[in-house]
Amino acid sequence: MERGAGAKLLPLLLLLRATGFTCAQTDGRNGYTAVIEVTSGGPWGDWAWPEMCPDGFFASGFSLKVEPPQGIPGDDTALNGIRLHCARGNVLGNTHVVESQSGSWGEWSEPLWCRGGAYLVAFSLRVEAPTTLGDNTAANNVRFRCSDGEELQGPGLSWGDFGDWSDHCPKGACGLQTKIQGPRGLGDDTALNDARLFCCRS
């Protein structure tokens, strides 16, 4: 989906926002039926545009953009971006990568995949709690649960704690939206703070 098309979903998403599992009418083009969230996301930044897998594709894997520790007196941002790797069934040779907005720092990891055609169905964020003194990082890492029960943990950093799992998509995730704090110059940067997944049924 082009960014312009994704941006048209924002008014609808604002109406659908809830702390957990949010039901929605099926979208005629992308077929998403719900949006799942976590309650542990960081407080900074703004929600970017959603990005969706092509029709008939589901997220079977993911990769992360992570800035390594910067030491003192560096400014750590930890997790900067999430990509979903979308596949149709068990065919990984024909995949599509979707990415909502990402932060400016770090490098992308190699993708981690669910086994045997399973799809990503739920997630949990590792988030460092805000501190008034010191360097905030917000989201540090993410775990995904596959439809066969396998759990995949990304190669993020270790500050903070993993929060509760989101609700589960009935079949699989098919889209992503991220909450990003833009660069703040000499201020404290946190980059990625929160994320949402879209669920599809076909």
UniProtKB/Swiss-Prot annotation:
Pfam family, one: VOMI
Disulfides per UniProt: 53-86, 114-146, 169-199, 174-200
GO cellular component terms, A-Z: extracellular exosome; extracellular space
SUPFAM superfamilies reported in the protein's UniProt record: Vitelline membrane outer protein-I (VMO-I)
Keyword check for Oxidoreductase: no
Localization in the cell: Secreted
UniProt keyword terms in alphabetical order: Disulfide bond, Secreted, Signal
Signal sequence segment: 1-24
Main localization category: secreted
Keyword RNA-binding: no
InterPro entries assigned: VOMI, VOMI_sf
Top-level taxon of origin: Eukaryota
Family: Belongs to the VMO1 family.
PANTHER family given in the database record: VITELLINE MEMBRANE OUTER LAYER PROTEIN 1 HOMOLOG, VITELLINE MEMBRANE OUTER LAYER PROTEIN I-RELATED
Name the UniProt record assigns to this protein: Vitelline membrane outer layer protein 1 homolog
Organism: Homo sapiens
Lineage start: Eukaryota, Metazoa, Chordata, Craniata, Vertebrata
